[in-house]
Amino acid sequence: MKAKRRILLQLLTFCLFLLLLAKIHFRNHQEEELLLSDWFNPRRRLDVITTTDWLAPIIWEGTFDRKVLETYFRKQNITVGLAVFAVGSLTDKYLDPFLQSASKFFMPGYRVIFYIMVDKYLQLQEMEHNPLQSFQVLKIGKERWWSNFDLMRMKILSEHIRDHIRYEVDFLFSMNINMVFQSEFGVETLSTSVAQLHPWWYFRKRTNLPYERKPTSVAHIPFGLGDFYYAGAIIGGVPFQVLDFAQQYLKGVFLDTENGVNSTYEKYLNKYFFLNKPTKLLSPEYSWDPTFNLPRHVWFVKIAHHPIDTL
């Protein structure tokens, strides 16, 4: 009888110990959790839309506290990936300005892996050494659908995410090559799913947004529906989220092709974010076309997205 009591007492003591450990873990987790209100203040920018209907933040200059974000993310010991495709005639003109500016302004102070997808042997230009940055030049082959650049890009990107990128980085961005960073693109942009607002269509009426209107297309968004119009120049998030978009895009293109329907990469992107709401939106400051007049809403251009052949 005494032996049974001793065993019960030991079990009770062990259970209490586990509860104590769980309480300590929960408290520590609470202390480490970063709340939106800790770093984001939409009231500082009453001149623009700063929060979506589903309560995702829209990042404008003045709305975020980078010091709070830096304190949090440095404890997380993160690595961020940036993928860019340098193929054909675009490489010679656009790659060097992209990489030179990105090495200076993209996630400074954090480990960064640049994934450069190329269709031919490439010797990178010399850049200032940064021990936190590394470069992977990844050769891609030409296949029968290679002429469809966006299809090729998403297929190759999805393969690399599955094969190795998901094990190497915590967050991943894919950007167009004809972009030049002009100021810091920092940790305020990090989230599970990141979408870029279109610099032209953001300032237009929602009824005029150029969604896919053909009902037979996978990318179709009916009239009267839709949230924003997203630009295809930047997509980001955690690797599995970027992979999910790439896979859904490829699936949509193949289904439409089988049915004799054509659409565009950006329209598939907008359909994806209509169904799968992004957790963070980047304002037009993060992908501004320098040929546009600068409106008063845009305080600082983070990236200049140059039209092809104007850089």
Curated annotation (Swiss-Prot):
SUPFAM superfamilies: Nucleotide-diphospho-sugar transferases. Residues 27-311 are lumenal. Glycans are attached at residue 77. The keyword Iron does not apply. Its main location: membrane. Substrate binds at residues 85-90, 176-178, 198-201. GO terms for cellular component: membrane. The keyword Glycosyltransferase applies. Binds 1 Mn(2+) ion per subunit. InterPro entries: Glyco_trans_6, Nucleotide-diphossugar_trans. Residues 1-5 are cytoplasmic. It is found in: Membrane. GO terms for biological process: carbohydrate metabolic process. It comes from the Eukaryota. The chain crosses the membrane at residues 6-26. Its cofactor is Mn(2+). CDD domains: Glyco_transf_6. Pfam families: Glyco_transf_6. Keywords: Glycoprotein, Glycosyltransferase, Membrane, Signal-anchor, Transferase, Transmembrane, Transmembrane helix. One of its GO terms (molecular function) is hexosyltransferase activity. It is a single-pass type II membrane protein. Its EC number is 2.4.1.-. The active site is at residue 266. Belongs to the glycosyltransferase 6 family. This is Glycosyltransferase 6 domain-containing protein 1. The lineage of its organism: Eukaryota, Metazoa, Chordata, Craniata, Vertebrata. The gene is Glt6d1.
